[in-house]
């Protein structure tokens, strides 16, 4: 089959950097899906992007759709044939609709009913006649924010400036917002010119001649290499923030790295202030010496070549000087602010219109933190530090520095607390109570940071649930999933013996006492338990625990999160052992039949008729104490070993004892034993969830 290469490019006004990579991926995915749906074969798809363009190159695109033979089902046989075996009007109409003769109809059985079928040959259409449909594909791309321009109804990330749609040497005709597809693309805005693409595979080469590196990965690689060259030349260390690298890659079409300098006096500012000023406001990379100390230099990436670099350097230095001067002013002014006075201002800052001020939240966090500290049995000195951290952990929200750089909240609190003479453990707790900030971030290392972090996150989550602000689908404006995942991570990292159910109930009760709930208390607690169970489930699956083993351990509850994970990991280590299946089958048999038991029926050993009943009862009594004690101390191996010892008594019991006998008293007594034993088993896991292939 004949093939041609195909190029599709959308030329735009400058896209925000965060739109570019996703836009490129969307376009490539949609083009690939379109070609597959249309049965048009191809050899390879490549994608390209810059701030001014999104493009796809398809190599070896067939000139025709694949031919296909389609099978269509018609009416049931009893409707299609009359009593004489002749085709009815229904059958004849079906044949006409399919474009075949009634002689070509045939009968097949589907789920016990016979139907008539027809096969028809559908010849593939010319690819060139189908490609104009890509217009709808282009307009279907979605972005975080869209705009309209002129009088067009289309809402899009930025106005479309040009379109290239070239199949071999044939332009595919279509138009969007008055822009017709053609052969001409734009080079670099200042260094290049418009250029005609007369062959799809020459796209990258022709753009490079016009100072555009169309391949985003090649741009990123070039930036990394240029930074590395500066490092080697100057004997510097330039930490490459991957997020910043991605951003600058999508800000430029032709990258050139350069470095500049700032006044050494600014090095008196905290490192985080300097780095944040450079990274967040200017997209600069900070520079360090081999000892890891910040130097008064920066590296930035210009969108252009090496011409007139000295002017570019001076301009960047001037802008950074203004930024750092502002930061130095904020830093000086903030130190004039008394911490307790700053804290009082939080009473005037609304946390949420239905939940009061940030000051109100701090009061709740302080109560909850004290309760958690008591459960952990901390010393009086540590409790004092926890109380102070909880009391002032948000004071830096009123500082000018955090107002300018919100991402420095907590860190500036630590710095200002140290300057104000707060104990080191209190200052550390302030910054740590925000941890972990994101997936993969570290947990608080100090007790005070850990306790206040848990209290703060639990209050935030419960308060939002209490007024109906529950994450749905991809919508989670208050980052409640992330905060719940942070709670789970802290509990795991420090193996904290804290009852999650108890903590959730206590948090909600405090909100109820403050009359802040708009959802019934019992409903809030139920929703929170389900929410946290899902976070634990996600974490288990992220760590490679099989879905059925995950469901098995979650069925026993999540009150002690570290124990849940230990149980799951132990099951993972046992699942492929020969005796595991026998264990699961035996324990599941007990659990299964226990479902038939009446509630609250006591076991009466005097009603046992067979030795196997007495043996199993003794095994139950012994196992109950062993399993409960082992799980309470977190020794899941001992709990599992105790369950293993019951397999032989269980096997012998079911071999010689009939549970569902006619005599009601005996049956109820035997079911009572099953029910009690199932409770012990269920405290470890629901083994019925485990699947064997």
Swiss-Prot record:
Top-level taxon: Bacteria
InterPro entries, per database record: DALR_anticod-bd, Gly-tRNA-synth_bsu, Gly-tRNA-synth_heterodimer
Principal subcellular localisation of the protein: cytoplasm
EC number: 6.1.1.14
Protein keywords: Aminoacyl-tRNA synthetase, ATP-binding, Cytoplasm, Ligase, Nucleotide-binding, Protein biosynthesis
One GO CC annotation: cytosol
Subcellular location: Cytoplasm
Molecular function GO terms recorded: arginine-tRNA ligase activity; ATP binding; glycine-tRNA ligase activity
PROSITE patterns the UniProt entry points to: AA_TRNA_LIGASE_II_GLYAB
Keyword Zinc-finger (UniProt): no
GO biological process, one term: arginyl-tRNA aminoacylation
Catalytic activity: tRNA(Gly) + glycine + ATP = glycyl-tRNA(Gly) + AMP + diphosphate
Matching HAMAP family: Gly_tRNA_synth_beta
Quaternary structure (record): Tetramer of two alpha and two beta subunits.
Family stated for the protein in its record: Belongs to the class-II aminoacyl-tRNA synthetase family.
Name of the protein described by the UniProt record: Glycine--tRNA ligase beta subunit
Phylogenetic lineage: Bacteria, Bacillati, Bacillota, Bacilli, Bacillales
